[in-house]
From Swiss-Prot:
Entry annotated with the keyword Cell wall biogenesis/degradation: no
Residues where ATP binds: 148-155
Topology class, membrane: Peripheral membrane protein
Name of protein: ATP synthase subunit beta
Segments forming a coiled coil: none
Family as reported in the entry's similarity comment: Belongs to the ATPase alpha/beta chains family.
Task performed by this protein: Produces ATP from ADP in the presence of a proton gradient across the membrane. The catalytic sites are hosted primarily by the beta subunits.
Gene Ontology, cellular component aspect: plasma membrane; proton-transporting ATP synthase complex
Length: 468
């Protein structure tokens, strides 16, 4: 193994000089002797000098320290030994429960599956969340993005999806915490532990307080672990169906921006790295389903300043099968989950895939909400009395639909005091179809707020009238 000397340190960027005939390749990992720090080669500057990014704090590093080339990319433990464990970007345990007992190690830089290995699925994944199941259904083996600005509920929605899908899902899950709050990572760990599914989850964290190198690579570490479960065939010759949760994909882009600036690249639009689309593609193209197994991925995407045209969320959109857009306006009405049904999309929204009843109900709900949106200006200026009877009916139904989209979450029980509700797709379609048909025109709109199925709304209305 060749050895070089550190010649320059600028923040997280470290330049190392090697003999000219032993220069490491790009993405090779270097170990700094006498420390725990790993460096990843990013550029070859010539004259034997390579520019690297430190995966860890560079505090205490100094010039002339020896760095050894491992002659391979960063490798992380994979397999059953990672389940129930919390690891960092290098696959080292951070849960104080001893070493990770892994039978194999895989490099985090890997190619995407070839076209002939990939497979697509139209099987629906029920989430138990009414607005998602009805308006932007998820596909098994698909990619889902939860888009939203600061504080509109991306992480809570993701936790509820984990609660509803990962617990009911007999397969394995991998959670990659990319540049988010350590507290949320801790909450997730305890949530999984309390519900006895910790032995089916591998957790990889590179949180907000970590250097940009860690935050840039931690998503790849989590993905590599998920790929192993997908590709490693069991006795029947099949891989597994894996759930991959990433919170938050925007921080991956942001870490890339920081690294890009440190490496001296010219910034592009809004200060992002010039390689934004390529970096996103490298990650997203690997999150796919093959003939042996599937990866269903749910990614939270922070939207800077609520601007969906910002280059980072705009680049992410192209890779997704379903987009769940969280709206600040809906959150301000107290309707949670604050999903915007007119702005959320799904490739599954096809009568041949989801069935005619589901498709027709979703379309009618959308039309009713769109009509209400158009009438809002008239109502604001002239008031409800100026509307025709037909328009008044549309507005009344739209307001009931809006409130019926709200739902108490299991993960928020501690804060709200009301027990969480899981609503099956069948009940969801039945409830919204009945509202659109006018079967519940006589009920007050408040009865539809924060309930599960339509029967609960009727029960709530009866209680309200009894009190009155």
């Amino acid at each position: 193994m060749s050895q070089g000397k550190i010649v320059q340190i600028i923040g997280a960027v470290v330049d190392v000089e090697f003999p000219r005939n032993e220069v490491p390749k790009v993405y090779h990992a270097l170990k700094v002797d006498g420390t725990e720090i790993t460096l990843e080669v990013q550029q070859q500057l010539g004259d034997g000098v390579v520019r690297t990014i430190a995966l860890g704090s560079t505090d205490g590093l100094k010039r002339n320290l020896v760095a050894t080339n491992t002659e391979r990319a960063i490798s992380v433990p994979v397999g059953a030994g990672t389940l129930g464990r919390i690891m960092d970007v290098l696959g080292r345990p951070i849960d104080e429960a001893g070493d990770v007992q892994a039978s194999d190690h895989w490099e985090i830089h890997r190619g995407a599956p070839s076209y002939e290995d990939q497979s697509s699925s139209t099987e629906l994944l029920e989430t138990g969340i009414k607005v998602i199941d009805l308006m932007c259904p998820f596909a098994k083996g698909g990619k889902v993005g939860l888009f939203g600005g600061a504080g509109v509920g991306k992480t809570v929605n993701m936790m509820e999806l984990i609660n509803n899908i990962a617990k009911a899902h007999s397969g394995l899950s991998v959670f990659a915490g990319v540049g988010e709050r350590t507290r949320e990572g801790n909450d997730f760990y305890h949530e999984m532990k309390d519900s006895n599914v910790l032995d089916k989850v591998a957790m990889v964290y590179g949180q907000m307080n970590e250097p940009p190198g860690n935050r840039l690579r931690v998503a790849l570490t989590g993905l590599t672990m998920a790929e192993y479960f997908r590709d490693e065939k069991d006795a029947s010759g099949k891989g597994k169906d894996v759930l991959l949760f990433v919170d938050n994909i925007y921080r991956y882009t942001l870490a890339g921006t920081e690294v890009s600036a440190l490496l001296g690249r010219m910034p592009s639009a809004v200060g992002y790295q010039p390689t934004l689309a390529e970096e996103m593609g490298v990650l997203q193209e690997r999150i796919t389903s093959t003939k042996s197994g599937s990866i269903t991925s749910i990614q939270a995407v922070y939207v800077p300043a609520d601007d969906l045209t910002d280059p980072s969320p705009a680049t992410t959109f192209a890779h997704l099968d379903s987009t769940v857009t969280l709206s600040r306006n809906i959150a301000s009405l107290g309707i949670y989950p604050a999903v915007d049904p007119l702005d959320s999309t799904s490739r599954q929204m096809d009568p041949l895939v989801i069935g005619h009843e589901h498709y027709d109900t979703a379309q009618r709900v959308q039309q009713t909400l769109q009509k209400y949106k158009e009438l809002k200006d008239i109502i604001a200026i002239l008031g409800m009395d100026e509307l025709s009877e037909e328009d008044k009916q549309s507005v009344s139904r739209a307001r009931k639909i809006e409130r019926f989209f709200s739902q108490p979450f299991h993960v928020a029980e501690v804060f709200t005091g009301s027990p969480g509700k899981y609503v099956s797709l069948k009940d969801t379609i039945r409830g919204f179809k009945a509202i659109c048909d006018g079967e519940y025109d006589h009920l007050p709109e408040q009865a539809f707020y924060m309930v599960g199925s339509i029967e609960e709304a009727v029960e709530k209305a009866n209680k309200m009238s009894a009190k009155a």
